[in-house]
């Protein structure tokens, strides 16, 4: 089997999953702490996408931990195919959500100047949530690339 950093069942794979989960949860918390985020579709989509990402990465993180403790090999063709599809789907959804939320934040701050006009609008929290979503996406994209590489090498 190919020795790639971040493959499932290793500490590198567990670290990738932990990073995905932590940044997805941080993005959800930052957005949920912003009053009125439900008035904007892009922010609701960000919360939904990060929720899916958090569940996916938590599940696979538990599987990685299980494989590490019992010294199991997770590099089987069927499992790898499932990991590739799941990682690619969640990476695409995370990127789309992060971009849409960041686009709305830029619109509010730089184009429409809504953040200056309405000091009650929690633009800083919106920014932080979008930034955490992009960080989550970097871990998710790295994991998707590793899984694709491993599936191609089987």
Curated annotation (Swiss-Prot):
Q: Does the keyword DNA-binding apply?
A: no
Pfam families hit by this protein:
CASP_dom
- Alphabetical keyword list: Cell membrane, Glycoprotein, Membrane, Transmembrane, Transmembrane helix
Principal location: membrane
Q: Could you tell me the superkingdom of the organism this chain comes from?
A: Eukaryota
> Which residue ranges traverse the bilayer?
18-38, 43-63, 88-108, 131-151
How does the protein associate with the membrane? Multi-pass membrane protein
Task: List the InterPro entries hit by this protein, alphabetically.
Answer: CASP_dom, CASPL-5
Q: Which GO terms describe its cellular component?
A: membrane; plasma membrane
Kindly list every residue the record annotates as glycosylated: 39
Protein localization: Cell membrane
Chain ranges sitting on the Cytoplasmic side read 1-17, 64-87, 152-154
Q: Does the keyword Transmembrane helix apply?
A: yes
- Regions of this protein lying in the Extracellular compartment: 39-42, 109-130
Protein family membership = Belongs to the Casparian strip membrane proteins (CASP) family.
Subunit description: Homodimer and heterodimers.
- Protein name per UniProt: CASP-like protein 5B1
- Organism, by scientific name, is Zea mays
